């Protein structure tokens, strides 16, 4: 609701300052540019990180110097998390696709992904020429989002406009676009398709077109109609007498191939090739129980509860744990009164878990995984008598539940808390690829009477 006023930035400066002459001056110029831009937008940069020795030296005297880079992350207040726009094109012919410019600059190819593929850098880089215009554009788009007038949207970044359009189609499995660029003044089609001037592409229902135009025009924000969705699985791009056809499924393979080539250097046992061959063969699908309504009331949950239930749960965390607040809220919604327990509470004896009926070990990277995944956390239980006694007494009771998420699951494995009665216990081993994996997996929950999974039976 507060627009840019609630936005704060975090800047991560990565620069080879000590490696060669002139880098300090380049860093100063970059910092001043960011500072001036933020002052114009009236937003702050209260935090960040500096890595100013970005150089790799080798025994033969050679060295590789990292390019000076700043990574900026923005955070702001979101008053309604349901008002979101995803970059997935809606296959509806009664909609229109628009481009909204944020730069107020001519289209330029300097520093673009297109230039890099040609082994070039370029000397003309697009930038925001008018900070006040940028602010107006941002606020106008926020108004469109707030009023629910945008069906889909995506920013223009690496790869330019054509990559943005393709990525909006990669996210679905059917349909495409027919794009006409005649209303864009620039005549150079390469610049139109590959320039990375700040801007966005939005999809709007035809019944909302006039309302969208009115908001943008009242704000003085430039926009251009690009085209409409089509049932064909391609993007047709035309300007004047020239038309180009981009096959979406073919271009998706091209788009993914760079990731595959990098993955091939990092993954073992042919996993990279298997992933490349399989990545588009697994649509993400969900199947819920027939009587699932997606309402709190179905499970007797009151999200506005302000009275204690008398049943306590505890979040147990170590240095490096994260996600504990979200987990605490989930437990609260499930009816628990939630308390926050740190390992120092258990080690010192301040906390005994005697009044707790459920504990959750949250995920993250306890002790930065320095000793291995959750091994240091497990040691804090095993080698501190009061913490171990509290845990042993907790699991000896018959009125307790426990859950380990991510790093917390690894902890439960290390502590032998999963099926402790088995003669052989599980161990967390390396993946076949010998690297961290984050995949979409299909899991079916069978009919069960588990306290935590019973309501998901058949999902």
Annotate each predicted stretch with a short phrase.
Residues 1, 27-32, 44, 50-194, ...:
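Intein/HINT protein-splicing elements and their conserved insertion hotspots or analogous self-processing inserts
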Residues 1-37, 49, 57, 139, ...:
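Thiamine diphosphate
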Residues 9, 46-48, 74, 99, ...:
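General beta-strand structural signal in soluble alpha/beta enzymes
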Residues 16-25, 117-130, 378-384:
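Glycine-rich tight-turn/loop motif centered on a GG-T
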Residues 25, 63-66, 170-174, 375-383, ...:
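A glycine- and small-aliphatic-rich helix-loop capping segment at beta-alpha/alpha-beta transitions
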Residues 68, 198, 439, 458:
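Residues that flank catalytic or metal-binding motifs in active/ligand-binding sites
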Residues 202, 433, 444, 448-459:
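Catalytic core of tubulin tyrosine ligase-like
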Residues 239, 243-405, 409-421, 429-440, ...:
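N-terminal beta1-alpha1 cap of cysteine-dependent amidohydrolase-like domains
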């Amino acid at each position: 609701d507060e627009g840019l006023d609630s936005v704060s930035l975090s800047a991560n400066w990565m620069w080879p300052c000590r490696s060669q002459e002139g880098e300090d001056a380049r860093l100063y110029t970059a910092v001043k540019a960011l500072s001036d831009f933020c002052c114009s937008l009236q937003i702050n940069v209260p935090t960040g990180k500096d890595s100013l020795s970005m150089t790799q030296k080798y025994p033969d005297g050679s060295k590789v110097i990292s390019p000076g880079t700043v990574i900026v992350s923005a955070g702001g207040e979101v008053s309604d998390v349901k008002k979101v726009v995803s970059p997935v094109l809606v296959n509806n012919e009664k909609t229109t696709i628009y481009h909204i410019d944020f730069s107020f600059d001519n289209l330029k190819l300097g520093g673009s992904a297109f230039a890099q593929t040609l082994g070039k850098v370029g000397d003309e880089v697009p930038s925001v020429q008018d900070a006040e215009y940028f602010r107006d554009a941002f606020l106008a788009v926020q108004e469109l989002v707030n009023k629910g007038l945008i069906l889909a949207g995506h920013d223009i970044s690496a790869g330019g406009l054509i990559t943005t359009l393709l990525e909006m189609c990669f996210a679905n499995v059917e349909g495409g676009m027919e794009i006409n660029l005649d209303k864009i003044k620039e005549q150079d089609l390469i610049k139109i398709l590959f320039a990375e001037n700040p801007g966005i592409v939005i999809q709007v229902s035809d019944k909302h077109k006039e309302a969208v135009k009115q908001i943008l025009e009242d704000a003085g924000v430039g926009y251009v109609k690009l085209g409409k969705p089509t049932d064909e699985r391609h993007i047709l791009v035309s300007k004047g007498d020239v038309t180009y056809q981009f096959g979406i499924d073919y271009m998706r393979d091209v788009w993914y191939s760079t990731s595959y080539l990098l993955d091939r250097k990092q993954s073992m046992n042919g996993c990279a090739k298997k992933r490349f061959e399989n990545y588009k063969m697994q649509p993400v699908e969900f199947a819920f129980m027939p009587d699932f309504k997606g309402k709190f009331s179905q499970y007797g949950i009151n999200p506005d509860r302000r009275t204690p239930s008398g049943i306590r749960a505890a979040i147990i965390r170590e240095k490096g744990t994260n996600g504990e607040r979200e987990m605490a809220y989930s437990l609260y919604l499930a009816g628990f009164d939630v308390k926050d327990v740190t390992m120092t509470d258990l080690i010192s004896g301040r906390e005994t878990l005697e009044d707790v009926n459920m504990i959750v070990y949250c995920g993250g990277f306890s002790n930065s995984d320095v000793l291995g995944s959750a091994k240091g956390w497990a040691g804090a239980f095993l080698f501190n008598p009061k913490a171990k006694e509290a845990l042993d007494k907790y699991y000896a009771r018959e009125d307790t539940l426990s859950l380990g998420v991510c790093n917390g699951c690894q902890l439960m494995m290390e502590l032998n808390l999963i099926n402790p009665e088995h003669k052989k216990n599980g161990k967390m081993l390396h993946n076949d690829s010998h690297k961290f994996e984050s995949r979409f997996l299909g899991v079916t929950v069978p009919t069960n009477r588990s306290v935590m999974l019973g309501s998901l039976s058949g999902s």
